[in-house]
Amino acid sequence: QHWSHGWYPG
């Protein structure tokens, strides 16, 4: 899974 929250590479 990949998220785009800023702390995770997404």
Swiss-Prot record:
Domain of life: Eukaryota
Coiled-coil region(s): none
Cited Pfam families: GnRH
Positions bearing Glycine amide: 10
Lineage, broadest ranks: Eukaryota, Metazoa, Chordata, Craniata, Vertebrata
Subcellular location: Secreted
Keyword Secreted applies: yes
Protein name: Gonadoliberin-2
Family: Belongs to the GnRH family.
PROSITE patterns named in the record: GNRH
Keyword Secreted in record: yes
Entries under InterPro entries matching the protein: GnRH
Function: Stimulates the secretion of gonadotropins.
MF (Gene Ontology): hormone activity
Modified residues (Pyrrolidone carboxylic acid): 1
Major location category of this protein: secreted
Keywords recorded for this protein, A-Z: Amidation, Hormone, Pyrrolidone carboxylic acid, Secreted
One term under GO cellular component: extracellular region
Natural source organism: Gallus gallus
